[in-house]
Amino acid sequence: MSKDLLKYLSTAPVLLTAWMSLTAGMIIEIQRFFPDSLSF
């Protein structure tokens, strides 16, 4: 149990960082092609 928990704690920040950078990259690309899409 503790080995699986340690593996999860070591991979979760990596996955979170990768997902956040990918999401930010997608938002930046959308903003480059559609500059007014996020202004309501």
UniProtKB/Swiss-Prot annotation:
A GO CC annotation given for this chain: chloroplast thylakoid membrane
Family matches, as SUPFAM superfamilies: Subunit IX of photosystem I reaction centre, PsaJ
Domain of life where this protein originates: Eukaryota
Cellular localization per UniProt: Plastid, Chloroplast thylakoid membrane
Membrane-spanning ranges: 12-34
GO biological process, one term: photosynthesis
Membrane topology value: Single-pass membrane protein
Keyword Cell membrane: no
Pfam family, one: PSI_PsaJ
Primary localization class, coarse: plastid
Alphabetized UniProt keyword annotations: Chloroplast, Membrane, Photosynthesis, Photosystem I, Plastid, Thylakoid, Transmembrane, Transmembrane helix
Family label: Belongs to the PsaJ family.
HAMAP family linked to this entry: PSI_PsaJ
Function of the protein: May help in the organization of the PsaE and PsaF subunits.
Name of the protein described by the UniProt record: Photosystem I reaction center subunit IX
Organism: Emiliania huxleyi (Coccolithophore)
